[in-house]
């Protein structure tokens, strides 16, 4: 991230890196805590302040990077940030037991398209870099 100057490329990169960070040991550990807290009220009560702070810090980071790129921190941008985080979290967890590259490609393409649609709406179509259509495979 530090090698990419502020702007749309950095914003695109942080969104694309979400899946990578979810698959890192620290990301997987956080996911395991999230999953464990669903059925254990004591764990949930113990980790909720920390997990909430991590989530809020992430939203602030992405919002700052988005603002540096000229984007407005609207509800749509926050919704996209949450969607990317939740989708890549689920993808990181699920691909350990269902390692289908096609699922990952489909999800990544959809998230990138949503991101570029937001960029086009806020900054104009000339700023968007939509991914090429996915090749249909049998």
Q: What is each residue range found by the language model?
A:
Residues 1-27, 77-84:
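Hydrophobic alpha-helical connector segments
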């Amino acid at each position: 991230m530090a090698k990419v100057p502020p702007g749309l490329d950095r914003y695109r990169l942080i969104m694309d890196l979400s899946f990578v960070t979810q698959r890192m040991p620290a990301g997987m550990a956080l996911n395991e805590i999230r999953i464990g807290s669903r059925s254990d009220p004591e764990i949930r009560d113990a980790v909720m302040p920390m997990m909430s702070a991590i989530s809020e810090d992430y939203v602030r980071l992405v919002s700052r990077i988005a603002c540096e790129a000229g984007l407005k921190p609207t509800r749509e941008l926050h919704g996209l940030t949450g969607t990317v985080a939740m989708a890549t979290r689920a993808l990181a967890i699920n691909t350990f037991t269902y390692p289908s590259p096609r699922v990952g490609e489909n999800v990544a393409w959809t998230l990138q398209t949503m991101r570029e649609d937001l960029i086009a709406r806020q900054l104009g179509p000339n700023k968007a870099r939509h991914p090429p259509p996915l090749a249909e495979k049998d």
